C-alpha cells in the first residue's frame, strides 16, 4: 500500500521521521513522499529524513517561528490562514501513485492538535484518496490542558478524515524511563505496526508472493466508514536452526519434520494473535466494540500455515463479533520471527478515550468558571474607582 505522509507539529514530524527510518531499515518501499509542517522552526531543523525542501514553516507572521505553545486554537487559525501554503507541500509529490494520505500528529499539544484537522479538511476537498489520521493521545500525567486539546482535536480529526489510527502514550510509557528515550521507543512501536500494515501487500525482494495477499483494498475496506482504529502486534522468535531454513532436529533424526513444523507453526501463530489483541494494542479498548478487522501473519514462507492464519482470523471474528474480519499472510524469507498484526477498525469503546473526554469536559467547565470569576472580579474593581455620578473625561 503506497502512502503519502504528512507530519504535523513536533510529535507528528518525529513519528514521520521514525517511519522513514523503519522503511529504510526493512528495505521496504511504501512511502511515496513525506512532508513535515510546523510553527516552530527549531522542530523542523531537528528532523533527519524528511527532505529539507519538504519542511514547511507556517504562521511565521504571527509567531515568528517560535511555535504556538499548547494553543491549538491559534494553530488551527494559522493553518486555515496559510492553507494554500500547506497544500504546496503536495506540489512536487507523486499524489497519483498514493493509495492513501496519512497525517501524523500529537493531539495534546498545539500545532499538531490544531492544524492536523485543517490540513485533512483541505486535502479531502481536493483529492479522491482516503485521508487517514494518526493521532497520538497524551498520557494522563501530561495534564488537563493536554487532555482538553486531545479530546477536541480527536473529534475534529474523526470528522474530517476517513479514519484515525489512535496511539495512547499512557498505555506504552514505562515508569522511570527518560522522556526522549520513551518517545523514541513509543514511536518505534507505532511505526513497526504501520510499516508492516503498508508493506504487507507489496511483493518481497525475494519475489515470494503471499498465498493470501493483503492489498491496499483490504486495508481501505477495513477502515471504511470512519471512526477510530487500534493496531496490535506480537512476534515470536524462531529457533536459530529454523530461522528460515525449515531445519529441525526431528527431521535430522529421520522423523517427519513437516508435521512438527506445522503444529509449531499453528501454535505460534494463534498464540501471537491472542497476544496482539489482548495486550499489545496501540489503543486499549473493548475488542467487541470493533466493527471490522484485519489479520496479517508475517514470517518465513514455510512457517505461514494457512490453517493457522484462518484459525487466527476466525478467533478475531469471535472476539469482535464482526463478520468483516479479513486475513492474509506476508512472507519474509530472511526473517527469524513469526509475527501477527491485527487491525481493529471503528472501535467504539475505549476507557482511555472516555477518560480523556471526561477530563476535557471538566477542564472546560473549570476554564469557563475562571473566566466568569475573573470578569466578576474586574467588575468589582472597576466599581471601586468609577462613580457614575461623575461625567466622563472623554
Swiss-Prot record:
The name this protein goes by in its record: Tubulin-like protein CetZ5
PANTHER family, per the entry: CELL DIVISION PROTEIN FTSZ-RELATED (PTHR30314), TUBULIN-LIKE PROTEIN CETZ (PTHR30314:SF10)
GO function terms (MF aspect): GTP binding; GTPase activity
Residues annotated as binding GTP: 10-14, 110-112, 142, 169, 187
Domain of life: Archaea
CDD domains: CetZ_tubulin-like
GO cellular component, one term: cytoplasm
Annotated SUPFAM superfamilies: Tubulin nucleotide-binding domain-like
Primary localization: cytoplasm
UniProt-annotated location(s): Cytoplasm
Biological process (GO), any one: cell division
Gene3D superfamilies, per database record: Tubulin/FtsZ, C-terminal domain (3.30.1330.20), Tubulin/FtsZ, GTPase domain (3.40.50.1440)
Family according to the record: Belongs to the CetZ family.
Organism: Haloferax volcanii (strain ATCC 29605 / DSM 3757 / JCM 8879 / NBRC 14742 / NCIMB 2012 / VKM B-1768 / DS2) (Halobacterium volcanii)
PROSITE patterns recorded: TUBULIN
Keywords on record: Cell shape, Cytoplasm, GTP-binding, Nucleotide-binding
